[in-house]
């Protein structure tokens, strides 16, 4: 995805990060950096180089809460996409409401991501999304 954006007009305004997310967020907080929007696609599970364990079910609320401190005075949106069965869209909605929504108000939407199965009119669940946006 980053190669596509680098060729587009927005290439100079978007940063793609592959890093330990919580460590990155803490560094950005210390530096005083602010963001108008955050788009995240955190993994369901991961291990750090020193054996640290990341589990979306356990760590997502902390990550979103800390990221809220990175938002500018008038943020535009906060989007989370996750391919997991361990967190429901209702839980994601509640996390956004208790963090970003509590600080900035705005509108929150959350739901399931799915792939349509056309031959029997079903949807294969693939994950969840949650979006906070300024009203």
Feature-to-residue mapping (PLM):
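Short, small-residue-biased leader/transition segments that mark boundaries at the very start
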Residues: 1-5
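A short helix-to-beta-strand connector/capping loop
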Residues: 9-14, 104-106
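Mobile active-site "lid"/loop adjacent to the S-adenosyl-L-methionine
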Residues: 11, 18, 35-66
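General small-molecule cofactor/ligand-binding pocket signal
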Residues: 15-17, 111
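Conserved SAM/SAH-binding loop
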Residues: 18-24
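A short acidic, Gly/Pro-enriched loop at the edge of an enzyme's catalytic core
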Residues: 26-37
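Helix-to-beta-strand junctions that scaffold the AdoMet/dcAdoMet cofactor pocket
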Residues: 71-73
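C-terminal catalytic and target-recognition region of SAM-dependent MTase-like enzymes
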Residues: 75-135
